[in-house]
Swiss-Prot record:
GO CC annotation terms, alphabetical: extracellular region; plasma membrane
Keywords on record: Cell membrane, Membrane, Transmembrane, Transmembrane helix
UniProt topology in membrane: Multi-pass membrane protein
Keyword Cell membrane: yes
Pfam families xrefs: UPF0182
Similarity section: Belongs to the UPF0182 family.
The name this protein goes by in its record: UPF0182 protein SUN_1015
Residue ranges of the TM segments: 8-28, 51-71, 102-122, 158-178, 207-227, 246-266, 274-294
Subcellular location: Cell membrane
Length: 919
C-alpha cells in the first residue's frame, strides 16, 4: 500500500498541475486578446466576479458541510457499538475501517470535491450577481406586490439561485451526515423498532430544520414566481392565482417557519409528537390549500364567470407584454384604400418604383456564387439589403467575398496554407435591387477582384480578416507572404499592415497559444517574427459574443462600405430577459428561447480589417443597458460618437421586427373582451417561393409613407386576419434619421376586400397566359423560381410585384426572366417591371422608361397624349376581337375610330412642336 501511495500522490499532483496550467493558459490567452481589443476591464470584471463568487460559495459550503460532517463523524464514533448489529449487517465489515486519519482525509476530500462543484455552480451565475449589484429602475410597478419590474429582472434571479443553492447544500450535507451516522451505528432498523442515539437524533433534526428554512424561502420565491403563471387565459397571475394560490403559499410559508423553529429547539424539549403533528398538519394544509383549494376556485368561481373574473388580469398581461416588446410605441394610422391610382401616380412615385426589390436574396446569392466567387476558395455566405447615396438614394443588395475555413482544395489543406497564407477574403459585390442586364443577370455596380465600381464609391481597403465565415486562427506579419487576391493567372501577395490580433513575439506567448489551440506548430514554426500576430475569434458573431456575453445578437449582420474606403460590419445587439413580470414569453424566435423582454439598445460596428469592435448605445433609456453601462463603463459609447457615414447605414433589425410582428398580431387587441375571444387575431401571410408556401419575410424598401414628403428606407410586412387571405393591415419600421425606430401600423378598412399575397398568387396562377408560359418553361427542363412577392403601398392603393427566375437543370445561375405586376383585377407578366406596369395601367410601351417624352397638359392625373394613346389601344384591341369573330362591319368601325384618335394625337403633337399638319 505504501509503495502505491507515492505514485498515486505524484500522479494526482501532476494532473492537478496540468489542469491549473491549462486554466491559466486559457485565461491568459483570452486576457491578452481582450487587452489588445482595449476591453481588458471587461475581462477583469467578469473574471473577478467569477472568482469572488466561487470563493464565497466554496467557503460557505466548506464551513456548513464541514462542521456538520465533523460533528457527525466524531459524535458518531462516541456512540459506536451502542446499538447492536445483526451478524449479516454490512457495517460489521466496514466499521473496523471507519476510524483514523485516513477516514478524516477521505471526508475532507469528499467535502472539498462538493465545495468545488458548488462553488463552480455559483460562479456560473456571475452575470446575475453583477446585475444584482447594479440594478436600474423601469419606473413600472406590477399591480400584485407593487414591485418595480427591475426587481424581477435584477434581484429575483439571485434570490432564486441562492435558495436553490442553499437547498442543494443542505441535502448534500444531510446525506453525508446520515451516511456517517449509519456507518457508525448511531441508528439501526430492526423488524420491531427504529433505534437511534440522542446525539444523532438531535443533529439530524437540526439539519431538517435547515431544510425547512429553505422550504420557507422557496415558498417566498414562489410568491413572486406567480407573476410568471400560465394557469389563466393570459400569461401572468390569474384570478385563481391571486385569490387562492397566493394565500396558500403564505400559509405554507408561515407553517414552514413554525416547523423550522420547532425543529431547531427540539433538543431542548424533545417532544416528538409535536414535531410529527406539525409535519402532518403541514402535509394536510399543503394538500388542501396548494392542490385542492385552487382547483375548487378555478372550477366553481372562475370558469362560470371567466371573462368577468379575468378581465383585470388580462389587462395587466396586455399592458406589460406591450411594454416589454416595445409594442406600446407603435403608432396606429388608418390607411384609406380606394385602388384608384393612375399612371401619373406611378410617375410621381418613380423613386419608389425604381427601388422595388426584384432580386430576391435567395436566388441572388446563387448568382453571386457563380459569377463573382472568381476562385473556388471564395464564398458568399449571405447577401444583405442596404441603401447608399450615389447620384440618388439607391437601395442595393451586397455580399462580402469571404475565404472560409475549408475553402481551399483538400490537397492544399496544409498548416501553412490554412493559417499563414490564405488568411482573408477580399471585396464585396453590389447591385441595385431592380436593375437587370439583357440576359437576366443583376447589374453589378461593384464587382471583380480587385474591386471595380461604376458609382461614386470609395474602395480602399477590402481585405476581410473578420467576417461570418472566418472561423479559424491565422498568423500574420510572418515570413510567409499572404495571398491577397488573384490577378489573371497570377496571384497578388501582401503583408498585413493593421493592428488586429495579439502579438506573439515571445516564446512564452507562442507556448500559451500552442497550448490554447492544441497546435504545436505555433511553437515550432520558423515563419514567425517579432512582429507576428495571431488573430482568433475572427467570426464576428463569436467575436462580439466573447466581448459581451450578456447581450443577444441579431442573426443578420451586414457589411457596409464606408466613405473612408474600408469595409465594416454592423451587428445589432439586444438586451433581453425572460423575467419581465406579466409579459408573454416567446419561445420560437431566432434570438433566444423564452424571452419576454427585448430591446435593440446597442449597435455594434466591427472593422473587417483590424477587427476593432465598438458598442454604441442607441437607446440609453433601456434600464438593462443602463445596468450594463454601470458594470462595464469602458465598453459602451454613446450613439452620437458613431461616425456619420455609418449612421447613414443603420437599419431596423429583421429579427426584432419579426418578433414584434408576431407579438403585435395578438397584442394589438387591447380590449379584454376581444382579447379573451381572440376574435381579431392577425397573422403574417404566406407567400409562394419556388414551388412551395412559406411565411412571408419582412422586406426593406425605399418609399414615401402616407402624409410624408420624401422617400425613406423602411422595413415592412403586410398582415392578414387569422385563417384569412385578405390583407387588413401593414406594419413598417422607419430606418432613416431622425425617425429611426418609429413603428407604424396602417390599418385597412374592414368593409373593403383588399387582396393579400396568397389571393394575388391565386390570381396569378389563374391567368392562362402566365401559367402556360411557366408550365412550358418547366417542361423544357428549367426550374421556375417565383421570388418574394412584394406588396407596395402607393398613395391610397397597393400594387403587387413578383419576380420570376429561371434556372436550367445544368446550370446553377438563376436568371430573372419575368416580372409579374398585379393591380386591382389586372395581372400582367412582362420581361421588365416597367413593361409590366405599362401593361397593367394600359400605357403605351416605352412611356415608363421615358416619362419625360410624354407631351401635353395634365388632365385628371394623366397627359392628353397618354389618354388618347390608351383610347387608340382600346379601339385596336376591339378591332382585333372583331376580326377573330369575322365581324367585318365592326372591324372597319373600330379601325376608323382608331384612325380618328391617332389623327387627334398627331395634331396635338404638331401644335406643341411646330411641325406641318398631317391630313
Amino acid at each position: 500500500m505504501k509503495k502505491l501511495k507515492k505514485p498515486i500522490i505524484i500522479t494526482a499532483l501532476a494532473i492537478f498541475t496540468i489542469y491549473l496550467f491549462s486554466l491559466f493558459v486559457d485565461y491568459y490567452g483570452d486576457w491578452l486578446w481582450f487587452k489588445n481589443m482595449g476591453y481588458d476591464s471587461v475581462f477583469d470584471t467578469i473574471l473577478l466576479t467569477k472568482i469572488l463568487s466561487f470563493i464565497l460559495f466554496f467557503l460557505i459550503f466548506i464551513l456548513f458541510s464541514g462542521i456538520h460532517i465533523h460533528f457527525a463523524y466524531h459524535g458518531g464514533s462516541q456512540s459506536r457499538n451502542n446499538i447492536p448489529l445483526a451478524d449479516d449487517d454490512p457495517r460489521q465489515k466496514i466499521l473496523p475501517l471507519y476510524q483514523g486519519k485516513a477516514v478524516a482525509w477521505l471526508w475532507a476530500v469528499i467535502i472539498l470535491f462538493f465545495a468545488i462543484v458548488m462553488g463552480s455552480y455559483a460562479s456560473a451565475y456571475w452575470h446575475d450577481f453583477l446585475k444584482f449589484i447594479y440594478p436600474s429602475s423601469f419606473d413600472l410597478k406590477e399591480p400584485i406586490f407593487g414591485k418595480d419590474a427591475g426587481f424581477y429582472i435584477f434581484t429575483l434571479p439571485v434570490y432564486q439561485f441562492v435558495v436553490s443553492w442553499y437547498l442543494f447544500m443542505v441535502v448534500i450535507t444531510f446525506i453525508g451526515v446520515l451516511s456517517s451516522y449509519y456507518i457508525d451505528t448511531a441508528f439501526n432498523f430492526t423488524s420491531r423498532k427504529f433505534n437511534i442515539t440522542g446525539k444523532a437524533k438531535s443533529h439530524l433534526t437540526q439539519l431538517t430544520a435547515f431544510f425547512a428554512l429553505g422550504v420557507s424561502a422557496l415558498y417566498f420565491i414562489k410568491l413572486y414566481n406567480i407573476l410568471y403563471s400560465s394557469h389563466g387565459v393570459a400569461y401572468g397571475p390569474s384570478y385563481m392565482d391571486v385569490h387562492a394560490q397566493i394565500p396558500a403559499y403564505w400559509t405554507i410559508l408561515v407553517m414552514s417557519l413554525i416547523i423550522t423553529i420547532l425543529l431547531f429547539f427540539y433538543p431542548f424539549y424533545k417532544k416528538r409528537k409535536v414535531i410529527v403533528s406539525a409535519l402532518g398538519l403541514w402535509v394536510l394544509v399543503w394538500a388542501g390549500f396548494v392542490w385542492i383549494y385552487p382547483g375548487i376556485v378555478e372550477q366553481y368561481i372562475v370558469k362560470p364567470n371567466e371573462l368577468k373574473k379575468e378581465t383585470p388580469y388580462i389587462l395587466n398581461n396586455i399592458k406589460f407584454t406591450r411594454t416589454a416588446f416595445g409594442l406600446d410605441n407603435i403608432k396606429v394610422k388608418p390607411f384609406s384604400v380606394d385602388q384608384n391610382i393612375t399612371y401619373k401616380d406611378i410617375l410621381d412615385n418613380r423613386h419608389t418604383i425604381e427601388n422595388i426589390r426584384l432580386w430576391d436574396r435567395r436566388p441572388l446569392i446563387q448568382t453571386y456564387k457563380q459569377l463573382q466567387e472568381i476562385r473556388l476558395y471564395y464564398d458568399f455566405k449571405n447577401v444583405q439589403v442596404d441603401r447608399y447615396h450615389f447620384h440618388k438614394y439607391t437601395e442595393v443588395v451586397l455580399g462580402a467575398r469571404e475565404l472560409p475555413e475549408l475553402g481551399i482544395p483538400a490537397r492544399a489543406q496544409t498548416w501553412v496554407n490554412n493559417h499563414l497564407i490564405y488568411t482573408h477574403g477580399y471585396g464585396v459585390v453590389m447591385n441595385p435591387v431592380n436593375e437587370i442586364t439583357s440576359d437576366g443577370m443583376p447589374e453589378l455596380i461593384v464587382k471583380d477582384i480587385p474591386p471595380t465600381t461604376s458609382v461614386n464609391l470609395n474602395i480602399k481597403q477590402m481585405a476581410i480578416y473578420y467576417g461570418e465565415e472566418t472561423n479559424q486562427f491565422v498568423l500574420v506579419n510572418t515570413r510567409a507572404k499572404e495571398f491577397d487576391y488573384p490577378k489573371g493567372d497570377d496571384n497578388v501577395y501582401a503583408s498585413y499592415a493593421g493592428k488586429g490580433g495579439v502579438q506573439i513575439s515571445s516564446l512564452f506567448r507562442r507556448l500559451v497559444y500552442a497550448w490554447k489551440f492544441s497546435d504545436i506548430n505555433i511553437l515550432f514554426t520558423g515563419y514567425l517574427t517579432k512582429q507576428s500576430r495571431i488573430m482568433f475569434h475572427r467570426n464576428i458573431m463569436q467575436r462580439v459574443a466573447t466581448l459581451a456575453p450578456f447581450l443577444s445578437f441579431d442573426s443578420q449582420p451586414y457589411p457596409v462600405v464606408g466613405k473612408d474606403g474600408k469595409l465594416y460590419w454592423i451587428q445589432d445587439a439586444y438586451t433581453t430577459s425572460n423575467m419581465f413580470p406579466y409579459s408573454e414569453p416567446l419561445y420560437h424566435n431566432p434570438i433566444e428561447r423564452g424571452i419576454n423582454y427585448i430591446n435593440n439598445s446597442v449597435k455594434i460596428v466591427i472593422d473587417a480589417y483590424d477587427g476593432d469592435v465598438s458598442f454604441y448605445v442607441i437607446n440609453p433609456k433601456d434600464p438593462l443597458v443602463q445596468t450594463y453601462e454601470k458594470i462595464y463603463p469602458k465598453l459602451f459609447k454613446p450613439f452620437s460618437n458613431m461616425p456619420g457615414f455609418l449612421k447613414a447605414h443603420i437599419r431596423y433589425p429583421t429579427d426584432l421586427f419579426n418578433i414584434q410582428t408576431k407579438m403585435y398580431n395578438v397584442y394589438h387587441m387591447t380590449d379584454p373582451k376581444v382579447f379573451y375571444n381572440q376574435e381579431d387575431y392577425w397573422e403574417i401571410p404566406n407567400e409562394t417561393y419556388s414551388r412551395g408556401e412559406q411565411k412571408m419575410f419582412p422586406y426593406y424598401i425605399i418609399m414615401r409613407l402616407p402624409d410624408t414628403k420624401n422617400e425613406e428606407f423602411i422595413l415592412m410586412i403586410p398582415i392578414t386576419p387569422s385563417k384569412k387571405d385578405n390583407m387588413n393591415a401593414w406594419l413598417c419600421a422607419r430606418c432613416d434619421a431622425p425617425n429611426y425606430g418609429e413603428l407604424i401600423v396602417y390599418t385597412l378598412p374592414k368593409d373593403k376586400l383588399i387582396y393579400g399575397p396568397m389571393q394575388i398568387q391565386a390570381r396569378i396562377n389563374q391567368q392562362p397566359d402566365i401559367s402556360s408560359e411557366l408550365t412550358l418553361w418547366g417542361q423544357q427542363g428549367s426550374r421556375v423560381i417565383k421570388g418574394n412577392q412584394l406588396v407596395i403601398p402607393i398613395k391610397n392603393s397597393f400594387i403587387y410585384v413578383e419576380p420570376v427566375y429561371l434556372q436550367s437543370e445544368e446550370g446553377q445561375i438563376p436568371e430573372l426572366k419575368r416580372v409579374i405586376v398585379a393591380f386591382k383585377e389586372k395581372v400582367e407578366m412582362r420581361k421588365t417591371l416597367d413593361e409590366a406596369l405599362e401593361a397593367v395601367f394600359n400605357v403605351a410601351p416605352g412611356q415608363m422608361a421615358n416619362p419625360q417624352q410624354s407631351a401635353g397638359k395634365h388632365v385628371g392625373g394623366r397627359t392628353v397624349l397618354s389618354i388618347e394613346a390608351h383610347k387608340a389601344l382600346e379601339h385596336y384591341n376591339k378591332a382585333m376581337d372583331s376580326l377573330r369573330q369575322n365581324d367585318w362591319a365592326n372591324f372597319g368601325k373600330e379601325l376608323d375610330e382608331m384612325k380618328s384618335v391617332l389623327l387627334k394625337m398627331t395634331q396635338s403633337e404638331t401644335k406643341s412642336s411646330g411641325m406641318p399638319k398631317v391630313k
